Amino acid sequence: MINELSVKAKNTNNKARIAFYVTFAVSVVTFAISFFIDRFSGLVGNVGLILIAVSILIFTKYISPVYYYDIMHDSSGAAVFVVRSVTGKRQSTFCRIGLSEIVKIEREDAVARRAHKTPHGVRKYSYVPTLGPDVTHRIYTRSRYERAEIVIEASDEFAALLLEYSVAARAAEMDSEE
């Protein structure tokens, strides 16, 4: 029996907030300096512009969105894994795969994640709310049209439950084919 579940992914460190505040403060200081110097004011202003763009990128990628990892049933009754992002009033569905398409789930620390090489022909999706998390889980999927690796930041209990439900969904799919 596959029960529906929704888990809110939490930031596990403050690296993104610190990076945002530092880049934003340096960009403000750089803009202020560009008004008071005569020489290279355009260059200093452009550096400030680049830094403010970086700070906006950090804010929109790591601070503003809230990720939800959902296990639910779709309209046909099939169990699916869904990754949603909520930013303000806007909600976006990033990933929606059948639980029967999940092949395996691996726990990775930061060193293993950096050392991992995604094979050619396999798509990689990262739905991690933390900048440089200590632990992530890599979900390997195989569907009729593509193979993919999905990186999420969830608890070990959620990953084990997701794997258990994927095995149950594959077994139910095999029973329905016979």
Predicted stretch roles:
Residues M1-V29:
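N-terminal membrane-targeting/pre-transmembrane regions
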Residues F31-A32, I58:
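Hydrophobic membrane-targeting alpha-helices
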Residues H120-E178:
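A membrane-cytosol interface segment of integral membrane proteins
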Residues A32-A53:
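Hydrophobic alpha-helical transmembrane segments
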Residues M1-E4, A53-K61:
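Extended, compositionally biased eukaryotic interaction scaffolds
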Residues I56-R96:
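Conserved beta-hairpin
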Residues S85-R144:
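Non-transmembrane, membrane-adjacent beta-strand/coil modules in membrane-associated proteins
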